[in-house]
Amino acid sequence: MKENRIIAHNLVKTFTKNEKKNKKVDINAVDGISLSVKEGEIVGILGPNGAGKTTLLRMLSKLMKPTEGMVSIRIGDKEISDDIEVKRHIGYLSNNTKLYGRLSARELLQMLGTIYGMPKEDTEQKIEEISKVLSLESFIDNRIEKLSTGQTQRASIARCLVHDPQVYIFDEPTLGLDILSSAAIIEFMKSERERGKSILYSTHYMEEAEYLCDRIIMIHHGKIISEGTPGSLKEETEKENLRGVFSELIVREGILDEH
């Protein structure tokens, strides 16, 4: 039986917003979310803009401290919650990652290998593996500032893989990409699932999530409103696709708003 690889319990993130007349209001961007992802599983986080997806993923990646709650990683028979130790097992892709434009993709990966304290030979071997998996060969020695959007995104993903993490957390990995670039990243995620990696990612593309994900978690206003397999969610709501599922759940919860 597959074990839970990443576990989050009751995550809350509260931000303070300044209102008129110097009044301050606390807003929960994430409001009591618990979840887990098993080894060899892809879980999609779906929700409209402002639902709390990016905040949630940043907390799961240990890049943002939660106001409440805990995130841990299970590696073998050990459960780890220390921030630094957890980060060593996570590859995080932001939806606005900025790369060093004057470096080539190869130079970037070599630099990261040094930062992670990897022996040079191990780094070079890992770069060759990553290059094949993500089809970087044709541009890996070109300066990043000269790459296309799709090539830059593949270089960004490569940056997350140098230290061979067990968990991938990707925020909108195919956003704004052409069909071929999106397909390459989707196939990459499928192949990594077969290798036993745990993948948690957010997307606005419902059809992509339906094709790719083993489970879906739908969130709105920082809360989980439903979760399950694509098939079970469609059966529950009697809808033909995830777009219809989400619309139905919003109506059921009575949380229709400007979205």
What are these regions (language model features)?
Residues 61:
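Helix-to-loop junction immediately C-terminal to a conserved catalytic motif
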Residues 69-81, 85-86:
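Conserved ABC transporter NBD signature motif
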Residues 143-147:
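Conserved ABC ATPase signature
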Residues 110, 114, 121-139:
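Conserved ABC ATPase "signature" region
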Residues 168-172:
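Catalytic Walker B motif of ABC-type/P-loop ATPase nucleotide-binding domains
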Residues 227-228:
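ABC ATPase "signature
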